[in-house]
From Swiss-Prot:
Its EC number is 2.7.8.-. This is Cardiolipin synthase. The keyword Cell membrane applies. The lineage of its organism: Bacteria, Bacillati, Bacillota, Bacilli, Bacillales. Pfam families: PLDc_2 (PF13091), PLDc_N (PF13396). Keywords: Cell membrane, Lipid biosynthesis, Lipid metabolism, Membrane, Phospholipid biosynthesis, Phospholipid metabolism, Repeat, Transferase, Transmembrane, Transmembrane helix.
Length: 482
């Protein structure tokens, strides 16, 4: 037997071993298990390499350090809120917030997401307005600027923002940037050179430790947060790049949703940034000092919780929040996501709502961002139509918003898509909102988007070609690992 034959046998044995690990040792969703078995079975030579890069679960090693949070009373505040809500003694700001006590309690217990009720919130659905506001706030910063973005491109918008950050760092402000190593893979390190020379600090999240191979490639930090002086925070779907200003020929106008927050909810955003920074950086760790958590004298009336989720937890906090919202629906469910690949639990919740007479409307893009993901999205949308849910195809560019609005009373806005990746593989962050005026603005934006969309009817869906149907079937089969 030649050397090549020996190598082939070794590879096949490794393939069987990884298949066994997938089935018997790693705790994962059944659908994902079967999807990986298909890959390992039908790609026997390279299947285990693909699995090593994309399939392995994160180790049990602690990724985020909660040490030091007692200095600002986070655990104490969380425990107090849990107990007061359990004892029905919590001073809710208005009846609508109190009405959704069960959802608030779930997110408190599941994620430690403290409810804050004094927030002033501004809604952005256009990238130009969002980045103009963000840069204006950065220009006014006096102490620190903390940014975390999945994508930070070195294009016109990226350079415009970077020049401001370089100047603020040179002024002596504490300026820190986290970018995702995969999402920002085309951005060269030299882009940050002047920023670092001026005193700014930048860290990639989960960079490759080996040339060409990153064994944590599948686990990405998809969060988008900006915190200025601990006083103002931004959360939502916009990354940093020209395409988010509608400058891409492929996508055209970019429709997204982002929030500017002034109030105690910024504390939660700050805490999230500190934990992510201390995970990404081996030096210049951030301590929980008072400078990062200034005293607020809130004038706002928006109640909200900032909820994080990621592969470091088995609880899928944001998805559980979505399901709780959907199960509570009595009249309407309006949902926007560029990728609609729900797992069985979320899909069943939406189906039950539609079959119960709730007006369910789901909005998806009219063009693919990722080909396989898009075909899986249209397949799930087609299945949902069978329950009476209405599917709308956004036809005015590209819809990237991740928004869920229920009964005009509660809403969620953030970075988490309605897909397996956001629920199980990505590090995400969402705002759950309970104030009717803010929720109404989100509902109005959705209804305005419907005027720029067309409805996908069963008749139109049935006209798909045999090739499209085949691509949908394959994409859905692989959807748990896309």
């Amino acid at each position: 037997m030649g050397l090549l034959a020996y190598l082939l046998v070794i590879l096949l044995i490794l393939n069987v071993f990884f298949a066994a690990v997938t089935v018997f040792l790693e705790r994962r969703d059944t659908s994902a298990t079967w999807a990986w078995l298909l890959v390992l079975t039908f790609v026997p030579i390279f299947g285990f390499i693909i699995y090593l890069i994309f399939g392995r679960k994160l180790s049990g090693k602690k990724i985020f350090d909660w040490k030091g949070q007692e200095k600002i009373g986070i655990q104490e505040s969380t425990a107090n809120q849990i107990e007061m809500i359990r004892q029905k003694e919590f001073p809710f700001s208005d009846p609508n917030v109190k009405k959704h006590r069960d959802l608030i309690y779930l997110l408190l217990v599941n994620d430690g997401a403290i409810l804050t009720q004094d927030n002033e919130v501004e809604l952005f659905i256009d990238g130009h307005e969002k980045f103009d506001a963000l840069i204006a706030d950065i220009e006014k910063a006096k102490d620190h600027i903390h940014l975390i973005y999945y994508i930070f491109h070195s294009d016109e918008l990226g350079n415009r923002l970077m020049r401001v950050l370089e100047r603020k760092a040179a002024e002596g402000l504490n300026v820190k940037i986290i970018y995702d190593a995969m999402g920002s893979r085309t951005t060269k390190k030299s882009f940050f050179r002047t920023f670092e020379k001026n005193g700014g600090l930048v860290r990639p999240f989960f960079p490759s430790k080996l040339p060409l191979i990153n064994f944590r490639l599948n686990y990405r930090n998809h969060r988008k947060l900006a915190i200025i002086d601990g006083d103002v925070g931004y959360i939502g779907g916009f990354n940093i790049g020209d395409e988010y200003l509608g400058r891409s020929k492929k996508f055209g106008y970019w429709r997204d949703t982002h929030l500017r927050v002034h109030g105690k909810a910024v504390y939660a955003m700050q805490t999230r940034f500190i934990m992510d920074w201390n995970s990404a950086s081996s030096t210049h760790k951030i301590d929980y000092k008072a400078r990062y958590f200034p005293t607020f004298h809130g004038k706002g009336h928006t109640s909200m919780q900032i909820v994080s989720s990621g592969p470091d937890s088995e609880w899928q906090q944001i998805k559980n929040g979505y399901i709780k919202m959907i199960n509570a629906a009595k009249k309407t469910i309006y949902l926007q996501s560029p990728y609609f690949i729900p797992d069985a639990s979320l899909l069943e919740a939406i189906k039950i709502a539609a079959l119960s007479g709730v007006d369910v409307r789901v909005m998806i893009p009219n063009k693919p961002d990722h080909a396989f993901v898009y075909r899986a999205t249209t397949n799930y949308a087609g299945e949902l139509m069978e329950t009476g849910a209405k599917i709308f195809i956004y036809d005015n560019g590209f819809i990237h918003a991740k928004t869920l609005v229920v009964d005009g009373e509660i809403a969620s806005v953030g970075t988490a898509n309605m897909d397996f990746r956001s629920f199980r593989l990505n590090f995400e962050v969402n705002a759950f909102i309970y104030e009717k005026k803010m929720v109404q603005k989100l509902e109005d934006a959705f209804l305005e988007d419907i005027l720029k969309s067309y409805q996908l009817t069963p008749e139109l869906y049935a006209k798909r070609s045999l090739w499209i149907k085949f691509k949908e079937a394959v994409s859905r089969l692989l959807s748990p690992i896309l």
